[in-house]
């Protein structure tokens, strides 16, 4: 069985639609099949605490041959564009299949405790770590996999870049502590900053682009992976 971890269903929905024989258990784990592989999809939530706890619980209940850490990631420079797909070589313990090498960027991914809100923060993180993209979960998912001897492959799609950043302050977009968007707060922010409405609409398009690219890349990856 191959497991796929996403932070949120907004990241996984297009891939999940590709699965045959879909079912969902009482913990929200989605079971299905694609290209002859049995797969289970679970959602960790956003950030270190959620990713560690949910991944540990999943691995205590299931024994995947491979876990794919997936979802969205932010580019640290504009060499990556929205919709590009990154293979995080520093966290992956399996090689990327050769058939994906021409369409998937390989590089270093950093994981942080908070969303980065400015191009300056992105530049500083890149200089400090050598990373080309950032997320909030993969490092912590990788630690749980390492502890249990589970092979890991990280494949993520770019949803934002220095020139196409988050449209609103991160705390307005998503409350990590509560694992949800505060919609009354979001509406209040937009009422006070109407110019942000257009930016939010553009970002919604960026997310859709990343979701499509990710589903395509995951479909190609699972087609290329050998069957155990």
Report each predicted region and the residues it spans.
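Short, conserved "active-site rim" segments that organize catalytic pockets and cofactor/ligand binding
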Residues: 1-19, 85
